[in-house]
Amino acid sequence: IYTLFVPMDASLAFPCFDQPDLKARFTFAAETPESWTIIGNADAVKTELVNGKRQTQFAETKPISTYLFAFAAGQFRQIAGSKSPTPLRVFVRQSKLKRAEEEWPEVARLTDEGMKHFVEFFGHEFPFTKYDQVLLPGFAYGGMEHAGATFLREDAILFRTTPTQSDKYGRASLVLQELAHQWFGDLVTMRWFDDLWLKEGFANLMAYHAMARIYDPAQMWRRFYQSHKP
């Protein structure tokens, strides 16, 4: 199970103002079946088994918009990523673990390189305590940049058929765009939803900015132009 409150549905789950420039610190605890893993915006600070159930308490978040609060819970398996300077992890269904382990090196490289590039280019450290990527089957979007925990549509990362190079570039664009949103959209947020275009446009641009560092720059900017020209 997972949440998806964008753009203004957090108030369906708890009393709040779904206004993006009104930010709050969230504390969150949940009880799940023992075999489940739960992922939230912040780190889990306490986990214990009580009467066959797993109780998890998360650290308080930094100030975030209500639409960026999220959790996902289920029989996920974790693929460990780098731990410095920001912990990077991927969570995937058990049935897709082998496939994810095959694709993880490339996704990890994109995330690592993107993280370094954005920290350097923005002149600001990663704004949250960790960065998780959770692969979800049938997710409504290609990705959603919840603070510290991006949710990605599973088949956008784990291809169902042999991918073309264009498919791989598309995946790179998605991974890097959602990562860029952690700064522009999550850390810095528009006043109201009529300016969604600003954060989306900027994150898309920055995805290609990072791709131009990772891949051939001329080819990436040509791809950017061809995919965005009127």
Q: Language model features by range: what are they?
A:
Residues I1-K130, D155:
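Acidic/His-enriched low-complexity segments
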Residues F58, V90-P230:
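Hydrophobic alpha-helical and helix-loop surface patches within well-folded domains
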